[in-house]
Amino acid sequence: MAMLPPPGPQSFVHFTKQSLALIEQRISEEKAKEHKDEKKDDEEEGPKPSSDLEAGKQLPFIYGDIPPGMVSEPLEDLDPYYADKKTFIVLNKGKAIFRFNATPALYMLSPFSPLRRISIKILVHSLFSMLIMCTILTNCIFMTLSNPPEWTKNVEYTFTGIYTFESLIKILARGFCVGEFTFLRDPWNWLDFVVIVFAYLTEFVNLGNVSALRTFRVLRALKTISVIPGLKTIVGALIQSVKKLSDVMILTVFCLSVFALIGLQLFMGNLKHKCFRKELEENETLESIMNTAESEEELKKYFYYLEGSKDALLCGFSTDSGQCPEGYICVKAGRNPDYGYTSFDTFSWAFLALFRLMTQDYWENLYQQTLRAAGKTYMIFFVVVIFLGSFYLINLILAVVAMAYEEQNQANIEEAKQKELEFQQMLDRLKKEQEEAEAIAAAAAEFTSIGRSRIMGLSESSSETSRLSSKSAKERRNRRKKKKQKMSSGEEKGDDEKLSKSGSEESIRKKSFHLGVEGHHRTREKRLSTPNQSPLSIRGSLFSARRSSRTSLFSFKGRGRDLGSETEFADDEHSIFGDNESRRGSLFVPHRPRERRSSNISQASRSPPVLPVNGKMHSAVDCNGVVSLVDGPSALMLPNGQLLPEVIIDKATSDDSGTTNQMRKKRLSSSYFLSEDMLNDPHLRQRAMSRASILTNTVEELEESRQKCPPWWYRFAHTFLIWNCSPYWIKFKKLIYFIVMDPFVDLAITICIVLNTLFMAMEHHPMTEEFKNVLAVGNLIFTGIFAAEMVLKLIAMDPYEYFQVGWNIFDSLIVTLSLIELFLADVEGLSVLRSFRLLRVFKLAKSWPTLNMLIKIIGNSVGALGNLTLVLAIIVFIFAVVGMQLFGKSYKECVCKINVDCKLPRWHMNDFFHSFLIVFRVLCGEWIETMWDCMEVAGQTMCLIVYMMVMVIGNLVVLNLFLALLLSSFSSDNLTAIEEDTDANNLQIAVARIKRGINYVKQTLREFILKSFSKKPKGSKDTKRTADPNNKKENYISNRTLAEMSKDHNFLKEKDRISGYGSSLDKSFMDENDYQSFIHNPSLTVTVPIAPGESDLEIMNTEELSSDSDSDYSKEKRNRSSSSECSTVDNPLPGEEEAEAEPVNADEPEACFTDGCVRRFPCCQVNVDSGKGKVWWTIRKTCYRIVEHSWFESFIVLMILLSSGALAFEDIYIEKKKTIKIILEYADKIFTYIFILEMLLKWVAYGYKTYFTNAWCWLDFLIVDVSLVTLVANTLGYSDLGPIKSLRTLRALRPLRALSRFEGMRVVVNALIGAIPSIMNVLLVCLIFWLIFSIMGVNLFAGKFYECVNTTDGSRFPTSQVANRSECFALMNVSGNVRWKNLKVNFDNVGLGYLSLLQVATFKGWMDIMYAAVDSVNVNEQPKYEYSLYMYIYFVIFIIFGSFFTLNLFIGVIIDNFNQQKKKLGGQDIFMTEEQKKYYNAMKKLGSKKPQKPIPRPGNKFQGCIFDLVTNQAFDITIMVLICLNMVTMMVEKEGQTEYMDYVLHWINMVFIILFTGECVLKLISLRHYYFTVGWNIFDFVVVILSIVGMFLAEMIEKYFVSPTLFRVIRLARIGRILRLIKGAKGIRTLLFALMMSLPALFNIGLLLFLVMFIYAIFGMSNFAYVKKEAGINDMFNFETFGNSMICLFQITTSAGWDGLLAPILNSAPPDCDPKKVHPGSSVEGDCGNPSVGIFYFVSYIIISFLVVVNMYIAVILENFSVATEESTEPLSEDDFEMFYEVWEKFDPDATQFIEFCKLSDFAAALDPPLLIAKPNKVQLIAMDLPMVSGDRIHCLDILFAFTKRVLGEGGEMDSLRSQMEERFMSANPSKVSYEPITTTLKRKQEEVSATIIQRAYRRYRLRQHVKNISSIYIKDGDRDDDLPNKEDTVFDNVNENSSPEKTDVTASTISPPSYDSVTKPDQEKYETDKTEKEDKEKDESRK
């Protein structure tokens, strides 16, 4: 790492001409160097700029203060990277770094010219940016004016002037564009430049449409981003996530195009079908009207309109489409609905319709229109689009954004780690300089009794030399003295807040002299280690605390924010507000005194007992007097007054931990044992002191920087805010304290809060006077109680302490507001103040962890979302202004197009507020309706562009970022372990006390009764036993002095707590004594059992809790195995578990009754070995065998399905179909008997015990009971009784029995049941959250939604005619068609308020509610148009908090819960390292494949040629291109095209048909009968046949079937095959892969959803079949038949249009409905609904389907997406294995799975990378040591395995995986078993080499013999002879050398042998033999 220059003021050097000359010299030296070693340069990476010294960042703290003369002056660059670049830096007062280019600006201003220097000074001054900021904001305000007055023109010029001035200054200071750091090199400056250029252009050049150009001024608002520092990063993140979205976008557009094509083919022109009047005037015919009608207006009078609708009623020609009323016929005429914008007539409109479907905006309307015009069967199209398009693609976008966010987070964490290391090195260097001095000084201070004053003097003398200090030491000294004199007496007051405070006053200014030697070093170390540990728990990595930290450790600002945001919501002293940021950002990370710091103390690691002498903490105090410990935690005292050793857990995982420890040891040895004389020598001591004071002052500096407030504040606080006047007062205070702090008081207050909330919730609209008075008195009482609580707490704790606790501040605010409200209660318009009382509800969070967590998550997200919200606000603002500037005028001018009365509609863009509302509505996902209006008044293109931009930028990206943040705050570990506080547990203590009291009473009673019966008390032993754990208090009480405990009231609480939890605690904490002390805050030990799933401590999690979780797991296992009693289609558990789960004797039933029963009633016990008992036992065994038989189960499943199916027939037409009715009645009886029989059989077989301990059996039991009761009632003739009727509807639950029978569904249900607790929790929290809005709504709108309407057309009377209720009643008496009516969904009471809020939150039916609210005037007054316009704000706030946050919380909770469940079930991934995962996944893929037999090449030459052509990749791609072209021609088609176009398209179509037929024929010729072995080929064949038939019989087919062209669209799916060939399409492949992976899970969820829909459809049919047809219920969409109910329910699954279906059901009495109406053909009377049933029905369905099932869908997709992305980044993917087998097929045409050794080299060279081994590859292949079977053949698996290993590298897990894989493969291909390997490639090579060596040796031997025997004449001949073999050998040796011997060796030695151990030797041996052979060979050569 390039070290930074030595920190401190010396590092600042003025930038002078010499500096410039030096830089130039360096540059020339560099260039000279570069010429010398050009080659080297490529290899090495150059230095990188330091990220802490980037322009725009704060100067790192380590540099200290800037010397006064150097502020705003050019200085030499501090970053070594720029040493040879022409740059200099300037620092402003705020220590921000500005970097400039040192070349002359604009070629004339050098860095030393006065003009440039002045420009630089202006530019870096903070006021300059403030001025620009203010200008921008003022400018924004002016832009929002819709009709600006004349004088604003001049203001405009001023703005332009200021912006020009700003740019001029920047250009003068920086230069224009040549070189780094000049004006145009910063992209943000481009924005300024463009804005200014446009300003001048529009002013001086006449460009026609000025308003469009003027909208460019809006971009000025974007400048805020460049001025505010945090925003740039967020925008960066946004841009990143948009980049990541590119793949999803491509996929989305592709899918939408395909769907749009299908829509175009199916529904072209259908939406023009309208109901046309039959009776025409004499001379009129249909044709004549069509031809003569010039405009839509003329046709209108002939069409049929439903009341209140703009468009004519649609109809269709098929039987299941919408029919026309009497007197009308269905005709295709006029334009499409919604101004003609909703249609499938051309590809573009179809695409828009599908985009709308995907975003689910008002899609129910499109759905209803299409089904009405085309027929109900087309529901299938919508199901596919909604599930694939909408759910899948939209959630993929979410997944991608979340991952981008997560990656960014990871990157930040990495960067932080890096910083930490650099920082460590830097500090080490500082330490070395100051270490000895420090040690000596500290020792001197401790061991001598020199007067304070001398020390002070010394430190003063040294402060001049201090490099870092800049504050006067005198100030500090004086303050220190004063502080010391003020040591207060009444400190140690038991309360833990007092404990933390006690350290504050005295040691605030204690110098580091008071720290022990080690203590002093520790301040340093603490600084390093604390940031690493999460402030809330030890859980997770070292850096978990920095999870959200964005900035570096060095920078002063910013870091604190992140830490603060992660801490406890309520007790966070370092709140996120105010200017304390710079204080909190310092290098110290404060220890939070009021939090459980699990991470500081343990007894695991000990360090020598060196501690601050006085045992006080070094601490700093902020404005509220909050103490932040700077040094370690408080010293712990032993009873004898000694100090306990302080212990630090170094739970470090990074590399610095080791060094820290060594340093600590080294330092201790050197510094602690100082020589005596050194201490006694005053001179030495003085020197030590002066050097040490340097550091001292640094520490002081830090503390000052961390102080929130000026010193006088502390003096004031200690004088006035701590009340210790007289001893009596103190006694009184203690008494009050004892009372107020008692848990029972807390319980009482909590009960009061709940009651108060109830009282507030009881307000409703028509209230009696008495009720009002009761509520008023109640309010007074509660206000009194809370005020009293506050006063008493103030007395008990002193204001100083009282306001340290977040909750207390909160309480005091609410009490104050309540009191103010009491006095202002009668003032008109202040009733809103009452809603402040509602905040009391939040006090519940104190004792309700989930609510607390929710608030924390919202707090956290708001912290992190602060910047994001700003960006969102800027985006909304920009678009609102753009809309207003572009379309405002058009709305005014063309308003008659969209409104008959020519008044502006509610949604328009004529002024800023309304424009803002439209943009906000688009962000909520409702864009299509306002867009139609916009397109109608302002033209299509501009509106489409603007709306799409808002939609994509705003809705998709920002809202998803919102979600990503929510999810990340969920997954961050510190929230899963809910932070328990002392207060939070007070309730539990109280409850425990009550329980104990009850138990005690029970016990005494029992003993008393037993005594009175004079029996020996049985229970005494038990009680002793249970009381026992409480005697082990040592477990729970960590080291605190007994003295302290007796003082501490909290201890008393502990006692209660501990004994209260008794045995449960005992279980979980029995063997954790060692950890006990650091689970909790050292000064307070509260033990709360932690659930194994959510424990804070990983250490505990691993071993201690394993026993616990095991028991959980086995329970789970038991449950699972027991589910077979009610279903034998059961999941076999993996491996060993299966054996465990089976009963001892599989075919014998268990005992009938539980042991308890048998003990009570001995008669239950039967002897089964003889007599009746034996017969009974035989019967039971027989029953058991029957029930356990698989056929029995299948039969029952069939019966369940049949009986459920039977329910679907009972619709309103059943009365007309008599035979079906009779059949159903009999069937019903039969089913009931069968199910009763099944139940009895199971009772006999399993016994009651087993049957009734199984939840699924209970379900069966209850459902059978219902059938039984209805059966009995029917036979007795009571079938028409009300209760019996409602019981009959419960039969709808029958399908639930299918749940336990289908594995897939059961898995989903189990997962859901697991999630229910957390879902309920979140639901409750949401209800509390919404309660506040609901009560507020009741206060604002109760009784104000009434209006006086004209019942004939439903219009409202204007206020001029009817002003209030009494006038309306007067009118009613005059005419019959007037009515004073209320909105059905209103805020008249809290319950209805909830319903209204649900409609607002799901954005369905919210418009009516909002309009009523905005128009409301007063109770009993007629509403007035937009009278209370700003009531919109109430809804906006609710949507943000109530809808976005809480509904997204559901997603968060479900996903989080699934992950936790996965952990509990022990998903393999949790226990695998990254390496193992890689191998595991590769194996998973390998095992599933096997070589296939390729289609053999035909022998015929001609066929062979065609075969080669057809199997070529190019052929495939060509066909693909043709398919795409065919699609394009299909896109060109449109409704009503010319005949010529028809003709052209017809011939193009013919060409395509001929081409595809040609392809088909070619393939048939070459592939022969093998053609039909491939699925796609069959599909193509069918399409071709249909197309040919279709050419001749087009009319007929289209009339009766779907048009055959549709099948061609499906062929697009073939694109999936081509994606494999395109390397760039990896991202899209990943997405599709994720979809494939999710399909099984999604299918299960779909099944479950279908089941839910089925049950609800049956319920709906029996309850709402006869309701009045209005709003959403009409002739097609209703609950009359099963099909119609399903159509309605599918629509509500996405929560679309449920308000319309609910509205008619809310009609409960005339005049809304007619209770006496007769329905012909049925006995039912009336068409009124049942409001309560209706509301329950729809709300429960929405919660189940919309919130739960749909969110499970999301969870699955997110999960699989992350898995798929992981897989795509792995070195070997599925495709590589596919490729391997494709190549294999060529080498092994008969699919023998073996290949000859001789072919291996070619095979390896034929593969694609990464498996490819290019030639020459012989040696590498030999070294792989592959097993061979007879005939020198090698198995494909062995080859693949070896190649895989080569790619992945060696891993220890290989062997086990290998065997797993083989097992898998064997089961897939039994053929392999017969071949046992005989040898291996390596062994074969060794044998060959050995053979040659033996041969050679033998030859030599023969040769020698020869030489001896024969005379020298023959020697030449012999030589020539001998050369032959030698030549061969040398050739082989050469080969060996050329192919890099190292490589061979490495592979040989690193690759482990395969699993055929019998054949091969172990590695080591093999390697050695290799070596010896080589040596032999070399010896041979040398011999020769």
UniProtKB/Swiss-Prot annotation:
**Which reaction does this chain catalyze?**
Na(+)(in) = Na(+)(out)
Positions of the II repeats? 725-988
Record field: compositional bias (Basic and acidic residues): 26-39, 489-509, 1019-1035, 1916-1930, 1960-1984
Name the InterPro entries for this protein: Ion_trans_dom, IQ_motif_EF-hand-BS, Na_channel_asu, Na_chnl_inactivation_gate, Na_trans_assoc_dom, Na_trans_cytopl, VGCC_Ca_Na, Volt_channel_dom_sf
List the membrane topology term(s).
Multi-pass membrane protein
Indicate the transmembrane segments per the record: 126-145, 151-172, 186-204, 211-227, 242-267, 377-402, 745-761, 771-795, 805-821, 831-847, 865-887, 940-966, 1186-1210, 1223-1248, 1251-1276, 1286-1302, 1316-1340, 1430-1455, 1513-1532, 1544-1565, 1575-1596, 1606-1625, 1639-1661, 1732-1757
Q: Name one GO molecular function term.
A: voltage-gated sodium channel activity
Keywords assigned by UniProt, alphabetized: Cell membrane, Cell projection, Disulfide bond, Glycoprotein, Ion channel, Ion transport, Membrane, Phosphoprotein, Repeat, Sodium, Sodium channel, Sodium transport, Transmembrane, Transmembrane helix, Transport, Ubl conjugation, Voltage-gated channel
The UniProt entry lists the main location of this chain as membrane
Expression sites (tissue/organ): Expressed at high level in the dorsal root ganglion and at much lower levels in the brain, sciatic nerve, nodose ganglia, heart, thyroid and adrenal glands and Schwann cells, but not in the cardiac and skeletal muscles, brain and liver.
The answer to whether the entry has keyword Glycoprotein is yes
**Post-translational modification (record):** Phosphorylation at Ser-1488 by PKC in a highly conserved cytoplasmic loop increases peak sodium currents.
Annotated site (Is directly targeted by the spider protoxin-II): 821, 826
The record's annotation in SUPFAM superfamilies points to: Voltage-gated potassium channels (SSF81324)
Keyword Ion transport attached? yes
Membrane-inserted regions that do not cross the membrane: 347-363, 915-927, 1393-1403, 1685-1697
Q: Which CDD domains match?
A: Na_channel_gate
Stretches forming I repeats: 112-410
Record family assignment: Belongs to the sodium channel (TC 1.A.1.10) family. Nav1.7/SCN9A subfamily.
Q: Per its database record, what is this protein's job?
A: Pore-forming subunit of Nav1.7, a voltage-gated sodium (Nav) channel that directly mediates the depolarizing phase of action potentials in excitable membranes. Navs, also called VGSCs (voltage-gated sodium channels) or VDSCs (voltage-dependent sodium channels), operate by switching between closed and open conformations depending on the voltage difference across the membrane. In the open conformation they allow Na(+) ions to selectively pass through the pore, along their electrochemical gradient.
How does the entry describe the domains?
Answer: The sequence contains 4 internal repeats, each with 5 hydrophobic segments (S1, S2, S3, S5, S6) and one positively charged segment (S4). Segments S4 are probably the voltage-sensors and are characterized by a series of positively charged amino acids at every third position.
Q: What is this protein called?
A: Sodium channel protein type 9 subunit alpha
What is the species listed in this Swiss-Prot or TrEMBL entry? Answer: Rattus norvegicus (Rat)
Q: What is the lineage of its organism?
A: Eukaryota, Metazoa, Chordata, Craniata, Vertebrata
Q: Which gene encodes it?
A: Scn9a
